[in-house]
Amino acid sequence: MEEVIQAGLAQWSRQKGLALPWDRTRGHPDVPWRNLTSSPTRPLAQPAGSCMPAEPSPAAHYHQLHVHLQLLPSDLSERPGLRLAPLALVEVGMTLPVPQTPLPHVTQQQKLAPGRQLCPW
């Protein structure tokens, strides 16, 4: 009965926009619908009083997400079920940070034909 109450309370608070302390973690032991698999945007749940910060730094978010998405294309041919994985990594309302330095593949212009400008998009 307690699990049902906890699940109902959690769903109600999500609809009302209230933030629960464990809402952005892998889940809560009393809430079966929030038991999620591990992903870069959801670190493992930390016990109360731990020294782990509540939110990782934006750079860590970007690095982990970027590395994870780089691994997906090779997996798609073998396991088509992973096609929705990039969407599942992004929290609703989460904004991805923009890196301050350009990515390496954007700055390498020596592979282009002479006289052609690199399209920024």
Swiss-Prot record:
- A cellular component annotation (GO) from this entry: protein-containing complex
Chain residue ranges for the region called Disordered: 21-57
Q: How does it assemble?
A: Interacts with core protein of hepatitis B virus.
| Name listed for the protein in its UniProt record | Putative viral protein-binding protein C1
